[in-house]
UniProtKB/Swiss-Prot annotation:
GO terms for molecular function: exodeoxyribonuclease VII activity; nucleic acid binding. InterPro entries: Exonuc_VII_L (IPR003753), Exonuc_VII_lsu_C (IPR020579), OB-fold_nuc-bd_dom (IPR025824). It is found in: Cytoplasm. The gene is xseA. This is Exodeoxyribonuclease 7 large subunit. It holds the Pfam family Exonuc_VII_L. It comes from Allorhizobium ampelinum (strain ATCC BAA-846 / DSM 112012 / S4) (Agrobacterium vitis (strain S4)). Its EC number is 3.1.11.6. Bidirectionally degrades single-stranded DNA into large acid-insoluble oligonucleotides, which are then degraded further into small acid-soluble oligonucleotides. GO terms for cellular component: cytoplasm; exodeoxyribonuclease VII complex. It catalyses: Exonucleolytic cleavage in either 5'- to 3'- or 3'- to 5'-direction to yield nucleoside 5'-phosphates.
Length: 543
């Protein structure tokens, strides 16, 4: 039994324990792969861990390796890792002796070329579109005349100077600048925080809340503009309650914030022009409306004045009105002298008779009665005069109120006229745009129909067109003389040719085939060889 367990064949291999072997493998691998660059696709990325580290895998079509980015290295990355993103990672290989596993500790990471960045942009665009962040129905209209404009850009670049200069030229308003980095590490977070910060302002706060926002940056490469493709920036722009204008790069540069913004400007200067109108144009429009209003008022006054004159002409003249009263007055004046004499005589007689009957007591009573009657009439006259004065004051008050309300009504009418004019202008612009679109669609359809019906499509399949000297197509051989110049048109050009002699007396191939068709089952007879023609007399043979 002892010989069964004894090793009769000694070995020269070194004996390791498991921990010794694992440690040796760890030292060998970490020494050999102390600094490596690996290209692969990110898989299993779920964002940063609560500790700040990031854990995921790099894979290709044949293998997979675990990867980790420590918190300090993650904050320095220019491009944040995303699921499915193809990257080139730089780092070192480490192993875990306790579980026989290895991983790469990534220190630097960048996309694997512009193609990877474009693929990532397209993937984000599809995802954001599915979420409704780019829905045109959520776009806000820009205010016609903003009082405060917020600008998110670099405070030291030429962009902010161009924006301020353009706004000052067109319509000077209050501008708030939120300084941010527009490229590099952390720039995307700064832009998103700036948009959210402007939206957090209160309308009646110490710092006024902007009526419109401009997010601007100058031109650059895809890597320079990458901050404006950041998910945080896109979501902040889409969620902004303040209308937002994106002006990133040149007209040919498109970033994801352009799709999320309410309006996209081709340049920062164009964004300033969209934000404010031209003050001189507004003043000219107001002057024109004021002139039209003054003209309308003058025309109305002239019309009323003409009506008044027409009514005045319809009234009789003053002489006609006073003719009859004057006649009556003259007649009365002529008989007044006699009437006065008779009346005086009658009154004197009556007075004498009454004086004979009067006594001192009666005279006193009559005098008291007359004085009392005069006092009552004087009081009544005072009350009547006071009522007349109050009535005239009320009439004057109503007239004053009417005259005071005339400017307000004219101002309201001016506002309504201005609103109607703006509405008509917008409807006219919309109608012109729709007509242009329909015309462009009609022209495109006609062009496609012409292309499909062109005979050159037939030439491309191997056919040809024979044209005469007048460049008209020839469709029959009849009437075509020998020696006539013709042109043969192929798909790639034309060649010239001359018609030669042909057997015009021979029947067409169809007729000949119809008359010589053999019976079924019999072989086709061989054609007879033509007889040799004899040369004319007196002419030698060449053979």
């Amino acid at each position: 039994m002892a010989s069964f367990f004894d090793d009769d064949q000694p070995s020269n291999l070194t004996e390791f324990s498991v921990s010794e072997l694992s440690g040796s493998i760890k030292r060998t691998i970490e020494t050999a792969f102390d600094q490596v660059r690996v290209r692969g696709e990110i898989s299993g990325f779920r964002g940063q861990h609560s500790s700040g580290h990031a854990y995921f895998s790099l894979k290709d079509d044949k293998a997979r390796i675990d990867a980790v980015i420590w918190k300090g290295s993650f904050s320095k990355l220019k491009y944040r890792p995303e699921e499915g993103m193809e990257v080139i990672a730089t780092g070192r290989i480490t192993t875990f002796p306790g579980s026989s596993k290895y991983q790469i500790v990534i220190e630097q990471m960048e996309p694997a070329g512009a193609g990877a960045l474009m693929a990532l942009i397209e993937e984000r665009k599809r995802r954001f579109t599915a979420e409704g962040l780019f829905d045109p129905a959520t776009k806000q209209l820009l205010p016609f005349m903003p009082k405060v404009i917020g600008v998110v850009t670099s405070p030291t670049g030429a962009v902010i100077r161009d924006i301020l200069h353009r706004i000052s030229d067109r319509f000077p308003v209050h501008v708030l600048v939120w300084p941010v980095k527009v490229q590099g590490e952390g720039s995307g977070d700064e832009v998103a925080n700036a948009i959210n910060g402007f939206n957090a302002f209160q309308p009646d706060g110490v710092i006024p809340r902007p009526d419109v926002l401009i997010v601007a940056r100058g031109g650059g490469s895809l890597e320079d503009l990458w901050s404006f493709n950041d998910e945080a920036v896109v979501r902040a722009a889409a969620a902004s309650a303040i209308p937002l204008i994106s002006a990133v790069g040149h007209e040919t540069d498109w970033t994801l914030i352009d799709y999320a913004a309410d309006v996209r400007a081709p340049t920062p200067t164009g964004a300033a022009e969209m934000a404010v109108p031209v003050k001189a144009d507004l003043e000219a429009q107001l002057a024109g409306l004021a002139a039209r209003l003054a003209g309308a008022v003058n025309r109305q006054m002239d019309h009323r004045r003409q009506n008044l004159r027409a009514l005045a002409r319809a009234l009789p003249s003053l002489d006609q009105l006073l003719a009859l009263p004057r006649r009556r007055f003259d007649e009365a004046a002529s008989g007044l002298g006699r009437s006065l004499e008779l009346n005086t005589m009658t009154k004197r007689q009556s007075f004498e008779r009454a004086a004979a009957k009067l006594s001192p007591d009666m005279l006193v009573r009559r005098l008291v009665e007359r004085r009392q009657r005069v006092s009552e009439r004087a009081a009544l006259s005072d009350r009547i005069i006071e009522r007349l004065i109050e009535r005239q004051k009320a009439n004057l008050g109503r007239i004053d109120a009417t005259l005071t309300a005339v400017p307000a009504r004219l101002k309201a009418q001016t506002g309504r006229s201005r609103d109607r004019l703006d509405s008509f202008s917008r409807r006219a612009d919309s109608a012109v745009i729709n007509d242009l679109r329909r015309a462009r669609s009609t022209v495109s359809a006609h062009d496609r129909m012409l292309q499909s019906l062109s005979y050159k499509n037939v030439l491309m399949r191997g056919y040809a067109v024979i044209r005469g000297q007048d460049d008209r197509p020839l469709s029959r051989a009849a009437g075509l003389e020998d020696g006539r110049a013709i042109a043969i048109e192929f798909a790639d050009g034309r060649v010239s040719a001359v018609t030669g002699e042909g057997d015009k007396a021979s029947p067409p191939p169809q007729a000949a085939s119809a008359t010589t068709t053999p019976a079924p089952g019999r072989p086709n007879p061989l054609p007879k060889s033509p007889k040799k023609s004899e040369p004319p007399a007196g002419q030698g043979s060449l053979f």
